[in-house]
Every structure is written in structure tokens, then in C-alpha cells.
């Protein structure tokens, strides 16, 4: 029997779909004979009492979740997400460098530094990547700090704003598609496969409503992992192999039958009725990994 702590924040229970998924994890763990306790930040001193830690709160090197991950890792516990995965996936510049180094097929990407905000560099980028381009700050999540620009003035404005957060930005070719593939990977095996649809009139799965602080999200369609294209799964696994053996969500675009990686995310979303819809065993597989 394993003692599993699931680190969460209050907001993890605000969405009924995520709340049901968390309850599914607890139910499956109990069915397998393990304990599964929800741990909030005030309880992190209890980490040494557990055999494994499963993080569902948003991960970031500056957040409490990272402290939890690093503490559990240093104690020798099984942990999802491990601190190295959080560091790599949380820094898009590092991630794209690894893609280039290990020949992972990915969206064409260039880097922009603070001293390159000038006309000549903008022209070079547009000539290499086309118009429009997508600008990303290194530390992004939930489609935030990701914007599309098609002219030099917009490019300059967005870059200056993002440079308040970072010394380096990623700039990518814009590849419009009706959906992005999301492949969930655990311990170098495909866990689930989904299509994240792009909302009508938008260009990414999660977009901010005009003039409002809220986001609009596209629909999610789940596939049985065995029915997903082999080349898609191979691409996802190759991208994860350079990071580690943890739990990842790989975003992939399909262009003319070929697959290119957008990014790899640690702490991927798992909502009841969405990612699990065609692959109900994902809960058991994650629990088994933690308890092993």
C-alpha cells in the first residue's frame, strides 16, 4: 500500500470537471488499496509522511507547487511533476533549444533578445517565418503571454511588453489549424489523445474574450490512444524523451499529414469527460506509476 499526497490549491475544485477528475483519482487509489490525501499549502510539512506526491496545482518555479516538487524529490519520493520537468517545460526557450538539439520536429522558431528591437531584425524574422508570427514569453501557461502579430508596430509593442518579464522571447511561424492535437504521455508511454478545437474566429484553443478578463475555450474531442495515428504518437514520445519520464501534455499541429510539436507541458489538464473520455484507465495508470 502506498501513501499518496495530491497537492492542490482551492481553485482546483472550482471547475466541476476538474473536481470530478480529482475525486476519480482518489477513488481509484482507494480501490487499489492506497491512501490518497489532498494536501494544501498549509500541509506541506507533512510531505515526509508520504511515499509519493501528485501535483495538480499550477506548476511554476516561483509557485508553491515547485517547492512541493523539489522537497518531495529531495526526500526520494515519487513525484509528478518532478522539479526538472517543471524547469524545462516552464522555460520555452530551453525547451525549443532541446527540440533543435535532438531533432524533434517543431514549429520554426527564432529567438529575440532585448537589444534586437529594431527594423532590420523584424524584417529578418518576417522573411524567415512569414507573416503573421506568434510571440511567446518563456514562462507561459494556459495560452497567456502568447500573441499573434502581423506588422512591425504590433511586433514592437508586444515585444516591449513581454520584455518586462523576460530577457529573451520565442518567435514562431503561425500555423493555422482547426485543432491542436494533445497527447498525454506518462513514463514514456502514450496515456491519452485528444483534439483541442480552436474556437470559431479564434486562432488558439484558449483565447481571451475581447474587452473581458475571461477566457473562451474550444471543445475537446477524445480518441482511444490505440486509434490515434502512429506518427502522431511517435512524435509526442520523441518530444518527451528529451525531458524525462513524467506526466506530460504534448501539443502538436498536423500540417499536410506531418506532425510538428508546438510545446510540451508539465502538469497537463485532466478534466472528467474530456481527456479521460476514451481512455478511462488513465487514472489507474497514474496511480500505479506513483505507487510503484
Name each model-derived stretch.
Residues 133, 191-192, 248, 260-263:
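Protein kinase-like catalytic core scaffold
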Residues 227, 241, 254-292:
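C-terminal active-site "lid" helix and adjoining low-complexity regulatory extension at the edge
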Residues 2-8, 75-76, 86-181, 230, ...:
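Active-site nucleotide/adenylate-binding loops and adjacent lid/helix of ATP-dependent enzymes
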Residues 58-60, 139-140, 267:
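Short glycine-rich anion-binding loops that position phosphate/pyrophosphate groups of nucleotides
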Residues 10-113:
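Conserved N-proximal alpha/beta basic substrate-recognition cap immediately N-terminal to
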Residues 38-40, 172, 245-256:
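A short glycine-rich, hydrophobically flanked beta-strand micro-motif that places a catalytic Asp/Glu
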Residues 144-240:
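Phosphate-binding site of ATP-dependent enzymes
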Amino acid at each position: 500500500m502506498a501513501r499518496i499526497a495530491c497537492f492542490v490549491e482551492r481553485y482546483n475544485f472550482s471547475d466541476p470537471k476538474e473536481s470530478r477528475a480529482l475525486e476519480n483519482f482518489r477513488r481509484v487509489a482507494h480501490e487499489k488499496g492506497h491512501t490518497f490525501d489532498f494536501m494544501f499549502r498549509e500541509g506541506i510539512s507533512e510531505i515526509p509522511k508520504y511515499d509519493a506526491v501528485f501535483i495538480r496545482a499550477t506548476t511554476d518555479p516561483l509557485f508553491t507547487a515547485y517547492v512541493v516538487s523539489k522537497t518531495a524529490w529531495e526526500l526520494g519520493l515519487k513525484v509528478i511533476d518532478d522539479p526538472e520537468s517543471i524547469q524545462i517545460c516552464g522555460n520555452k526557450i530551453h525547451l525549443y533549444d532541446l527540440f533543435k538539439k535532438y531533432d524533434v520536429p517543431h514549429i520554426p522558431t527564432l529567438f529575440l533578445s532585448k537589444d534586437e528591437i529594431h527594423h532590420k531584425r523584424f524584417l529578418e524574422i518576417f522573411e524567415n517565418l512569414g507573416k503573421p508570427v506568434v510571440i511567446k514569453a518563456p514562462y507561459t501557461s494556459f495560452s497567456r503571454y502568447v500573441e499573434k502579430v502581423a506588422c512591425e508596430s504590433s511586433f514592437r509593442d508586444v515585444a516591449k511588453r513581454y520584455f518586462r518579464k523576460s530577457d529573451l522571447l520565442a518567435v514562431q511561424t503561425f500555423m493555422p489549424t482547426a485543432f491542436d492535437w494533445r497527447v498525454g504521455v506518462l513514463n514514456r508511454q502514450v496515456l491519452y489523445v485528444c483534439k483541442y478545437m480552436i474556437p470559431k474566429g479564434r486562432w488558439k484553443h484558449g483565447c481571451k474574450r475581447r474587452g473581458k478578463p475571461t477566457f473562451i475555450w474550444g471543445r475537446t474531442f477524445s480518441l482511444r490512444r490505440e486509434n490515434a495515428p502512429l506518427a502522431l504518437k511517435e512524435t509526442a514520445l520523441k518530444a518527451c524523451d528529451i525531458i524525462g519520464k513524467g506526466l506530460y501534455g504534448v501539443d502538436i499541429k498536423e500540417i499536410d499529414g506531418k506532425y510538428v510539436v508546438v510545446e510540451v507541458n508539465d502538469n497537463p489538464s485532466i478534466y472528467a469527460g474530456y481527456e479521460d473520455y476514451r481512455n478511462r484507465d488513465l487514472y489507474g495508470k497514474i496511480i500505479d506509476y506513483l505507487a510503484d
